[in-house]
Amino acid sequence: MRGLFVCLLVPLMLSGCVVPPQEGPSLEDVTTTGTEADPCQLGFAHAKEPLRSDEEHAMASELSLPSPVAYEVTLHVFWNAADHPADFPPNPHFSPLAGGPHSEGFRLWQPGELASPAIEMQAEAGDPEPLRQAYRQGGTQVLPTQFAVGDLVDSPGRTTVAFRTDSEHTFLSVTSRLAPSPDWFVGVAALPLTSGGAWIEEVAIPLCVWDAGTDDGRSYASANEQPATPQPIHLLKGRPLSTDPEQAAQVGELILRRTE
């Protein structure tokens, strides 16, 4: 029995879990210095670090971890008209959460990089199948049978997917489209599943909205506007989600929980 976890969420400030001291790192262990002031960047700090080769990763302490292990990932969304009244659309929902575990050298998507065709389809149409195919192309860096696809979820609401992983695949990438929207989505990219040589037991990551950079639409129901030049994936700031042009809005949280 792993003990009692008390998960805390303070919107737009900090998210994390109080974990028994003998097991499981906290959110602060997962993230790196410099993210504390911007909760929207939690879960992405690792992507800014130089990647190790697969050979270097094989020598890392993670290989001493017990495996396989099982996790549940819950997408809890609370995007609503009361908190985000500007142009709020009918039928607010999120597409099926899609993604899976992988090794350090693999990227399903990454902030600051151009969206792949698979991410474009997920962000614009909520279609997880191209993403599944892109994931499978990762070879030994992924676990093809563990690519998970959840259910469409109305907002507010929640959906949960499950996956298993091992000591060679200790990162997680998942996405879900905010809909209706031009090309907006939520998710994490290369979120570490370990810290300090231990599997993460439970953690909550704030979810803000990312713009895939593949459509120039500025509101939920905007007509398709193909950009002259695709833009890198970036946080969506200002309207219609936030009244502050410099602020991204939190619309949910991703809760990761180890189940065995």
Residue ranges and their predicted role:
Residues 22-35:
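Ser/Thr-rich, Pro/Gly/Ala-heavy low-complexity intrinsically disordered linkers and tails
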Residues 12, 33-35, 203:
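Disulfide-bonded cysteine motifs in exported proteins
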Residues 14-16:
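C-terminal motif of bacterial Sec signal peptides marking the signal peptidase cleavage site
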Residues 1-4:
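Positively charged n-region of N-terminal signal peptides that target proteins for export
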Residues 137-260:
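Mature, soluble, non-transmembrane domains
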Residues 43-47, 52-56, 60-70, 78-186:
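Structured domain cores in non-transmembrane regions
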Residues 18-20:
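Bacterial signal peptide processing site
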